[in-house]
Amino acid sequence: CAGALVAEKLPHLKHVIRMGSEKSAGMHNFSAVCQLGSAAEFSQLDVIEGQLHANDPINIQFTSGTTGNPKGATLSHRNILNNAYFVGQNMHLSAADRLCIPVPLYHCFGMVMGTLCCVSHGATMVLPCEAFDPQPVLQAVQDEQCTALHGVPTMFIAELDDPNFAHYDVSSLRTGVIAGSTCPRELMKRLISDMDLAGIVTAYGQTEGGPVDTMTELDGAFEAQV
């Protein structure tokens, strides 16, 4: 029956909610789940919504601790939503895009610039692997025809230097974000020539900024990107 999931390899997974109107064995349908709430619960939701403000804290994101002990940065709804929205706008992201997100979701790169960026623009999220591995990332870009790819410089270097890189078709890529540290000039040249990422943008920021403070333009000159 719907929602009665029994997975031998994932015994602890009990519920899967699928989008769309179709029904699948072992899965809940999203529209049906939306109808499960009672009138009293919807009334309670209205009360809670009335008490919330855009500047209320939504997340305490810990910094990396490169200049001292990690600090808990308190981020607001307005902060991370605007950050994600404007990153997507700068990438010209739309519902036609498929963003590959190999960066960790517990970090502001994956959480804000990845998942929330997709949600705010209707783009598809592609999560290639549990922990970064260049081959699953390249495979996902090829199989899912990803149009965008995020990563820090060392991730992109690992992908480009993978022995099997030439066997993957990454021609669907057009944009993405490189951040976390300065992008070397030679790496930017390789991203443009070998991964078709002429539209990649460089982001600079800090956790406290949620995380992007400034970034280059999609069609900016090469010198501006590095």
Where are the regions a protein language model picked out?
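Conserved S/T- and glycine-rich ATP-binding loop of Class I adenylate-forming
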Residues: P57, T63-T66, L99, L105, ...
